[in-house]
C-alpha cells in the first residue's frame, strides 16, 4: 500500500497528514508531548516549561483535524494557549469549565479524552461541533447559542456554595457574545451576589480594548496577586469603620486608578467584578501566573480579559478571519477549501438578491440581521443599500423590537434571522409585533434540519410557535423560485406581520422568475393532479413528495401533490377538496408537532370533513426528539420525511405493509 505524504508549510511543520488508501491518517510522531495526554490530569503532570510545546502540538492537531472534517476553525486556533493554560492550572472536571457558544471547543475536546474521535467531528455518530453534556464530563454545560455561559456558571457557583463545595467555576465568553443582553443580566446578578465565579473574556476582535503589552501583563499579575488583594481587602475592612462618604470615595479612587492604568475594566468593576487584564492570550508566560493567582482568589466574581487572535498560527486564517470562521475540508498547504460548484443558488442568496430588487423599487425597505449578515444573505442587501442595512449584533430580542419601531414609522423592515435564533426573541414577536399588528417581515432562514450543527441549530419549532399567534401570515417556500414570490408578497403585506421560512443550502435548480409577483394570501396550488392519494406539502419536502408520487404511481396509486404555500391563513378550500376527493390525505412539513399538520387537522375537524370517516388523514412531522447531527439527507431519512418514508406512510394509512409491497425507490 502506497503512502503519500502531503507537504505541510512552515506554520505547521513537524506535522504530516498521510494518505493510506482512501483513509487520511495523522503522523502522531510529530506530537510527542500531546501523545502522552489522555486527560488534563496528564497535562498537569508536565513541567511548566513543557506547556508551550503542548500548545504548539495542540494547534497542529487542531489544524489537521479540521482540514479533514471541516467545522468552526478560527476561534479554536485563537484559544489554543488559553485552553492549555486553563486545563493546566485548574482541576477540571472538578473545576467546572463552561465554553460560551462552543465554536472554540475543538482544542478542549482534544485535551479531554476525545482526540481519538476528533476526526469524526460533526459527522453522523461522531463528536458534536459544540460542547455537549452527554459527550464528556469535561462538558458540564452544553452550548451552541451564544451568551449563556455566565448565567449557567453562576448557577453552578451558587449550587456549589449551597452544597458547601470549594471548586472553581470558569466561564469563557467571547467579545461578540458580550453584545447580547443576557451576558450583562448574568454579570449584574453575579456582581450583586458576590459569588466566587471566574469569567474569562476572550477578546478576539479587540473590540473592547487593545493589548498593552508588558505593562499590562505586569499590572495584571500585580492586581491578581495575593499581596495586592490582601491590601485591598484590608482597605475594605478599614473602610467599614470610616464615614460612608469617605469610604465610597476611597473605593472609587482605587477603581478608577486601576482603570486608568489598565486602560479598561471600569464597566466590569461597576457590575461588581474584579477586573484583571488585558492579557496577551498567546503568551503563556503571562497567562499561567495570572490564572494561578485568579484560581487562588477567595472572593469573587472576577473577570480576566484575554486578548487573542482568530486563526492564530495558521497564516491563511490569520489573514482572513471571516473566511476561516467556519470551513469545509481544506488543503493545509494552501488553505484552499474544497467547495463543490453549486448546482443552484443558495436560499439565503436568493433571499438577499430578491430583497435588493424589491428595495430598488421601494425606499422604505430595510434589512436587519443579528450578527449573521452573510449567513442570511443580508450582506448582499448591504452591498447595495448599506444605509438601509442594520446589523444589531447578537441581540435577537432587540432586533425584533427595533424592527417593530421601524414599522411604526412606515418603513418595511425585513428581519432576517435563523429559525433557531428567532426563539430567543419570541416574547418580542408576540408582545411588540403581533399584538400591535405591526408589519414586520420575518425571513426565517435555516428552517428544518440543518445537518452538521445538529439539534441546537435545527429550525424545528417556528411553525408551531408562530402558528399560534393571531393575525400572522406564515409561508414556506417549496423552492427558490417560490421564495422570490414570497419576498414580493411580504413587501405587499402592510397591515400585519408576516414570515417566510426556507432551509439551509442550495435550491432545486428550477427556472427563476425575473421579478417576484405577490401571491394571493392564503392560497395554495395543485402541482400534480391524481385521484387516490393526496400529499399536501408545506415547504421544501415538495421534491420528496414528487419522488414518492412517482413510486406510488408504479403501484397503481394515482397521487395528487399540492403545495400549501401558506400555513396561516390556511387554504381551507384546498384542504377540504383534497380530503373530499381522495382516500388518503397526508400532510408533510419540516417542523415539529403543533405546526402545519395540526392546523390542517383542526380545519378538517371544524368543517366536519372527518365525520363520515371517508378519508384517512396522517401528519408527517419531525419526530418528538432532538435529532443529533448528521447530513440533512440522513437526518430527514431518520425522521421519515423522505420519499421512502412518505410511501411507507401511504401504505400504512391503507393498512398495507410497505415491505410486502416490495417498494423500491430509485
UniProtKB/Swiss-Prot annotation:
Keyword Nucleus: no
One Pfam family hit: DXP_synthase_N
The keyword Chloroplast belongs to this UniProt entry's keyword annotation: no
Pathway(s) this gene product operates in, as recorded in its UniProt entry: Metabolic intermediate biosynthesis; 1-deoxy-D-xylulose 5-phosphate biosynthesis; 1-deoxy-D-xylulose 5-phosphate from D-glyceraldehyde 3-phosphate and pyruvate: step 1/1
Stored InterPro entries: Dxylulose-5-P_synthase, THDP-binding, Transketo_C/PFOR_II, Transketolase-like_Pyr-bd, Transketolase_BS, Transketolase_C, Transketolase_CS
Enzyme class: transferase
Binding site for thiamine diphosphate: 103, 144-146, 176-177, 204, 314, 396
Residues reported to bind Mg(2+): 175, 204
UniProt record similarity statement: Belongs to the transketolase family. DXPS subfamily.
Keyword terms: Isoprene biosynthesis, Magnesium, Metal-binding, Thiamine biosynthesis, Thiamine pyrophosphate, Transferase
Function text: Catalyzes the acyloin condensation reaction between C atoms 2 and 3 of pyruvate and glyceraldehyde 3-phosphate to yield 1-deoxy-D-xylulose-5-phosphate (DXP).
Co-factor binding comment: Binds 1 Mg(2+) ion per subunit.
Species: Nitrobacter winogradskyi (strain ATCC 25391 / DSM 10237 / CIP 104748 / NCIMB 11846 / Nb-255)
PROSITE patterns: TRANSKETOLASE_1 (PS00801), TRANSKETOLASE_2 (PS00802)
Catalytic reaction list: D-glyceraldehyde 3-phosphate + pyruvate + H(+) = 1-deoxy-D-xylulose 5-phosphate + CO2
GO molecular function, one term: magnesium ion binding
Entry protein name: 1-deoxy-D-xylulose-5-phosphate synthase
Subunit structure: Homodimer.
Coiled-coil ranges (or none): none
Gene Ontology BP terms: 1-deoxy-D-xylulose 5-phosphate biosynthetic process; glyceraldehyde-3-phosphate metabolic process; terpenoid biosynthetic process; thiamine biosynthetic process
EC nos: 2.2.1.7
Cofactor list: Mg(2+); thiamine diphosphate
Amino acid at each position: 500500500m502506497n503512502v503519500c505524504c502531503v507537504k505541510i508549510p512552515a506554520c505547521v511543520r513537524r506535522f504530516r497528514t498521510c494518505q493510506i488508501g482512501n483513509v487520511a491518517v495523522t503522523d502522531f510522531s510529530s506530537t510527542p508531548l500531546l501523545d502522552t495526554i489522555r486527560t488534563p490530569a496528564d497535562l498537569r503532570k508536565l513541567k511548566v516549561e513543557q506547556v508551550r510545546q503542548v500548545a504548539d502540538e495542540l494547534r497542529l492537531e487542531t489544524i489537521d483535524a479540521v482540514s479533514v472534517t471541516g467545522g468552526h476553525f478560527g476561534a479554536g486556533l485563537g484559544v489554543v494557549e488559553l485552553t492549555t493554560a486553563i486545563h493546566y492550572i485548574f482541576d477540571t472536571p472538578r473545576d467546572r469549565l463552561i465554553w460560551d457558544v462552543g465554536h472554540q471547543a475543538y482544542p478542549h475536546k482534544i485535551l479531554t479524552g476525545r482526540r481519538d474521535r476528533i476526526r469524526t467531528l460533526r459527522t453522523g455518530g461522531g463528536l458534536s461541533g459544540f460542547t455537549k453534556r452527554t459527550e464528556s464530563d469535561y462538558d458540564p454545560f452544553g452550548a451552541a447559542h451564544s451568551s449563556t455561559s455566565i448565567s449557567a456558571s453562576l448557577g453552578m457557583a451558587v449550587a456549589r456554595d449551597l452544597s458547601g463545595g470549594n471548586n472553581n467555576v470558569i466561564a469563557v465568553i467571547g467579545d461578540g457574545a458580550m453584545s447580547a443582553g443576557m451576558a450583562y443580566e448574568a454579570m449584574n446578578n453575579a456582581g450583586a451576589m458576590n459569588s466566587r465565579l471566574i469569567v474569562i473574556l476572550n477578546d478576539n476582535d479587540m473590540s473592547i480594548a487593545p493589548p498593552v503589552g508588558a505593562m499590562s501583563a505586569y499590572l495584571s499579575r500585580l492586581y491578581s496577586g495575593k499581596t495586592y488583594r490582601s491590601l485591598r481587602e484590608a482597605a475594605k475592612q478599614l473602610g467599614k469603620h470610616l464615614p460612608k462618604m469617605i469610604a465610597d470615595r476611597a473605593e472609587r479612587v482605587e477603581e478608577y486608578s486601576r482603570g486608568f492604568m489598565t486602560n479598561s475594566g471600569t464597566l466590569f468593576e461597576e457590575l461588581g467584578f474584579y477586573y484583571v487584564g488585558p492579557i496577551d492570550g498567546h503568551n503563556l508566560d503571562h497567562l499561567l501566573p495570572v490564572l494561578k493567582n485568579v484560581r487562588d482568589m477567595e472572593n469573587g466574581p472576577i473577570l480576566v480579559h484575554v486578548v487573542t487572535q482568530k486563526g492564530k498560527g495558521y497564516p491563511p486564517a490569520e489573514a482572513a478571519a471571516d473566511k476561516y470562521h467556519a470551513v469545509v475540508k481544506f488543503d493545509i498547504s494552501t488553505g484552499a477549501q474544497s467547495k463543490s460548484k453549486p448546482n443552484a443558488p443558495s436560499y439565503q442568496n436568493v433571499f438577499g438578491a430578491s430583497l435588493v430588487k424589491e428595495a430598488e423599487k421601494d425606499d422604505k425597505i430595510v434589512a436587519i440581521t443579528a450578527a449573521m449578515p452573510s449567513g442570511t444573505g443580508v450582506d448582499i442587501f448591504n452591498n447595495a443599500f448599506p444605509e438601509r442595512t442594520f446589523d444589531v449584533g447578537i441581540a435577537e430580542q432587540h432586533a425584533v423590537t427595533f424592527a417593530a419601531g421601524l414599522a411604526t414609522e412606515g418603513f418595511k423592515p425585513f428581519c432576517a434571522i435563523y429559525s433557531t435564533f428567532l426563539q430567543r426573541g419570541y416574547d418580542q414577536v408576540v408582545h411588540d409585533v403581533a399584538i400591535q399588528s405591526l408589519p414586520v417581515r420575518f425571513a426565517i432562514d435555516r428552517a428544518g434540519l440543518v445537518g452538521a450543527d445538529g439539534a441546537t441549530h435545527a429550525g424545528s419549532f417556528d411553525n408551531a410557535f408562530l402558528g399560534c399567534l393571531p393575525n400572522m401570515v406564515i409561508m414556506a417556500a417549496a423552492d427558490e423560485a417560490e421564495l422570490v414570490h414570497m419576498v414580493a408578497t411580504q413587501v405587499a403585506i402592510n397591515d400585519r406581520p408576516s414570515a417566510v421560512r426556507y432551509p439551509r443550502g442550495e435550491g432545486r435548480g428550477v427556472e427563476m422568475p425575473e421579478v417576484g409577483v405577490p401571491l394571493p394570501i392564503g392560497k395554495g396550488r395543485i402541482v400534480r393532479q391524481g385521484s387516490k392519494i393526496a400529499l399536501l406539502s408545506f415547504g421544501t419536502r415538495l421534491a420528496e413528495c414528487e419522488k414518492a408520487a412517482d413510486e406510488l404511481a408504479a403501484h397503481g396509486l394515482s397521487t395528487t401533490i399540492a403545495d400549501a404555500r401558506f400555513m396561516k391563513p390556511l387554504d381551507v378550500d384546498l384542504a377540504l377538496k383534497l380530503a373530499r376527493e381522495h382516500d388518503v390525505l397526508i400532510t408533510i412539513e419540516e417542523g415539529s408537532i403543533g405546526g402545519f399538520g395540526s392546523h390542517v387537522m383542526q380545519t378538517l375537524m371544524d368543517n366536519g370533513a372527518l365525520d363520515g370517516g371517508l378519508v384517512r388523514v396522517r401528519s408527517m412531522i419531525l419526530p418528538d426528539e432532538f435529532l443529533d447531527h448528521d447530513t440533512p439527507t440522513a437526518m430527514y431519512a431518520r425522521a421519515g420525511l423522505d420519499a421512502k418514508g412518505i410511501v411507507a406512510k401511504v401504505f400504512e394509512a391503507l393498512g398495507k405493509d410497505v415491505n410486502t409491497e416490495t417498494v423500491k425507490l430509485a
